[in-house]
Amino acid sequence: VPVSIPPALDAQRGNGPDWAGWLDRLPRLAADVVEEWGLTPDGESMHGACSLVLPVRTTGRAPAVLKLTYDGDDESEHEGLALQRWGGRGVVRLLRADPHRRALLLERLHTEDLSDLWDVEACEVVGGLYSRLHVPALPQLRTLTSYVARWTDDLQRMPRNAPIPRRLVEQATALARSFVVDDASTGTMIHGDLHYANVLSADREPWLVIDPKPMSGDPTTSRRRCCGTGGTSWPATSAAACADASTRWSTPPASTRTAPATGSWCGW
């Protein structure tokens, strides 16, 4: 069965030749994995910002999804390792993986996500997942501090005539540098992109997490990602209540500093 590439994913060709090359290879790659793993297509192709997601049935007729991720996305390189480490505890279950081809076979979840809930209720759900996700980091993972160091270098190169007060740039740079050298900034495996759209309803548990951008970091940064991604602007009271909800459920924080947001959205 020919694999169709959703137009919105195919539009990523505009990001350069690496993207275009991967998209050219993608239909054949998908067809090869489907055949080799004995899968049967079972619905319309879906996509995230950097992945193709195909609903399939396994050889045992179990519903699943085949996820094929852009091979130039370093943030998702160790997604399979992280899912294997979590072992389905609070997260989508990994059924099979081919890291070389960035192919993951995952249990199929529902399409409803936390965006359908009241903000505080959604943050309570996410907060309840923190203690299950925040485990000792795998040695293969990139560190959050490596990303922050790179972002800080970019910030320092900002021209002095940029439309932002220089003192704010200098303050942000100083805070980032202190974050990078703090030992508490690494050592815990964090999801890296834990927001409403990355928590889907399921049968095995009420809610399960998808699409990690795993890294070794500080678990307190997860709260910033959750409370900073709500889809629409929140009233101050709602934002504060949500932050309180996620904090009460999270693992004991290593610090109370303000940390940078991490990652970017990518469904599934």
Task: Please give the residue ranges for each predicted region.
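A cross-family kinase active-site recognition segment
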Residues: 1-4, 8, 112-170, 187, ...
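Conserved NTP-binding catalytic cores of kinases and kinase-like/nucleotidyltransferase enzymes
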Residues: 1-91, 202-206
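An alpha-helical support segment within catalytic cores of ATP-dependent transferases
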Residues: 22-32, 138-192, 202-203, 251
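A conserved alpha-helical element in kinase catalytic cores
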Residues: 27, 60-105, 110-133
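Active-site acidic catalytic loop and adjacent metal/ATP-binding pocket
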Residues: 46, 50-58, 65-66, 94, ...
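Active-site Asp-x-Gly
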Residues: 201-247, 251-254
